[in-house]
């Protein structure tokens, strides 16, 4: 589930960003409208490996499991295989993982990237607001990314993919992943399967009612029945985000 690669290992589901051999997209979604997600960024290291969200002109929010010490951030991207004229590529000056990030449990799977210069904001590159409160179950959210579009096999569209999916209740989430869901995680998607984020979507945005409520984190497979995507619960980190940005 989500914008990452997921591998079941010793009973634990672990999320990985994609490698240069493995790109990814959303399963069961649709091609986004050209400026549907101007906050969406592509994290690059010679290839797209994760997504992220522009939250100010100089800061991007992503998943801690996407960490690299140096990252090229591509903003205004839509078709990865074409130059649309709207792209901005800015290198990172700082990459800051949450100090409580646990690579085994994926608790606190959140990371800030400071850009080496401010992005130029326009209709194709813009920020997404942080949450003013936590999202409620049943709310429909927009997930986007360049991840795998197949739940079995690989098909990698170049155009940004979108998916509308509901927030599940905490009880539904915990029942799907017994003993694995912390208070810093939310489940979003369909228990019947068929629609989900997937490998390569990791770190990307979940926007609900115009606010950034989730970060693609982990799951078992992609779009598998009974296993919705698991996302970092951004509303728990607003203070950490603001404090980290102001002190760096």
UniProtKB/Swiss-Prot annotation:
Subcellular location: Secreted, Extracellular space
Record-marked site positions (Required for specificity): 196
Leading EC class: hydrolase
Cystine connections: 32-162, 50-66, 134-235, 141-208, 173-187, 198-222
Pfam family, one: Trypsin
Gene3D superfamilies the record matches: Trypsin-like serine proteases
A GO molecular-function annotation: metal ion binding
Positions of the propeptide removed during maturation: 16-25
Source species of the chain: Gallus gallus
GO biological process assignments: digestion; proteolysis
Active site residues according to the UniProt entry: 65, 109, 202
Keyword entries, A-Z: Calcium, Digestion, Disulfide bond, Hydrolase, Metal-binding, Protease, Secreted, Serine protease, Signal, Zymogen
Xref: PROSITE patterns: TRYPSIN_DOM, TRYPSIN_HIS, TRYPSIN_SER
Name recorded for this polypeptide: Trypsin I-P1
Binding annotation for Ca(2+): 77, 79, 87
EC number: 3.4.21.4
CDD domains listed in its UniProt record: Tryp_SPc
Recorded catalytic activity of this chain's protein: Preferential cleavage: Arg-|-Xaa, Lys-|-Xaa
Limits of the Peptidase S1 domain: 26-246
One GO CC term, this protein: extracellular space
Signal peptide: 1-15
